């Protein structure tokens, strides 16, 4: 699993004698690693931010899309121990990229929340106003959210199960998937002797398909490809087979 280097964060905060660090940003769960902030990490981060007077900005748009989570995951939304801004929106809740309606939940100590809310009101009014047309659409979109969440969860969880089946059945056996705790994407790992760019170019040349290499996400080494779990099941299985075929060609062991 993935872990947060809280010791390094503490060192950065301690060294920031000019108090230039004003907020800590967390993605919960992260994309594309799919890793949630673990309970112990959350406690440490809240304690550090409170001690150094730093706010938390938590992007939790994928939180409801659990895949293979560990126990004890919680949203930062509603955190009372430190000033917290939790981000969410319809584009992920409804799996609708065109639904550009987002919101921020502010929580924490009362005085901090009141001051932050006052300032956010000014920002929202001056720079991010919502039209009446969009505002009218919010209630019906909220009403559809539970059913849409369930449909997307069923799709992503089903595709992840199918991915495990296809990888187990692959006779070459050199591709695996990192544990995905939540979200819409997974990271495939293949032999690092294969250049990520060359693999993607091979997919484009031989299958008219593409992918996101690991270096797009600052992965620490070569040999990763991000794969979406949102595709229709048949298309998803085909995509996996295309990747396995590209890996086999790269290793010069294809049939």
Task: Please tell me what each predicted stretch does.
Residues 139, 154-164, 175-190, 221:
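Conserved glycine-rich beta-strand-loop-beta hairpin in the small C-terminal domain of fold type I
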Residues 78-157, 252:
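Conserved core segment of the aminotransferase class I/II
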Residues 105, 187-189, 228-230:
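Short hydrophobic/aromatic beta-strand micro-patches
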Residues 2-71:
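Active-site phosphate-binding strand-loop segment of PLP-dependent enzymes
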């Amino acid at each position: 699993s993935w872990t947060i280097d809280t010791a390094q964060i503490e060192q950065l905060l301690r060294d920031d004698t000019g108090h230039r660090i004003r907020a800590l940003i967390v993605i919960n769960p992260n994309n594309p690693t799919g890793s949630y902030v673990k309970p112990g990490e959350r406690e440490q981060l809240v304690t550090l931010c409170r001690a150094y007077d730093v706010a938390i900005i938590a992007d939790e748009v994928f939180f409801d899309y659990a895949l293979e989570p560990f126990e004890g995951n919680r949203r930062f939304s509603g955190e009372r121990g430190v000033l917290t801004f939790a981000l969410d929106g319809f584009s992920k809740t409804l799996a609708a990229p065109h639904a550009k309606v987002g919101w921020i939940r502010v929580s924490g100590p009362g005085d901090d929340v009141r001051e932050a809310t006052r300032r956010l009101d000014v920002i929202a009014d001056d720079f991010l106003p919502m039209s009446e047309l969009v505002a009218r659409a919010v209630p019906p979109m909220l009403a559809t959210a539970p059913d849409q969440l369930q449909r997307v969860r069923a799709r992503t969880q089903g595709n992840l199960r199918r991915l495990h089946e296809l990888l187990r059945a692959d006779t070459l056996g050199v591709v695996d998937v990192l544990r995905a705790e939540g979200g819409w994407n997974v990271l495939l790992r293949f032999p690092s002797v294969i250049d990520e760019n060359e693999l993607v170019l091979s997919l484009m040349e031989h299958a008219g398909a593409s992918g996101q290499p690991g270096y797009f996400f600052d992965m620490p080494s070569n040999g990763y490809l991000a794969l979406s779990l949102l595709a229709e099941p048949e298309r998803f299985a085909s995509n996996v087979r295309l990747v396995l075929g590209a890996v086999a060609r790269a290793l010069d062991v294809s049939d």
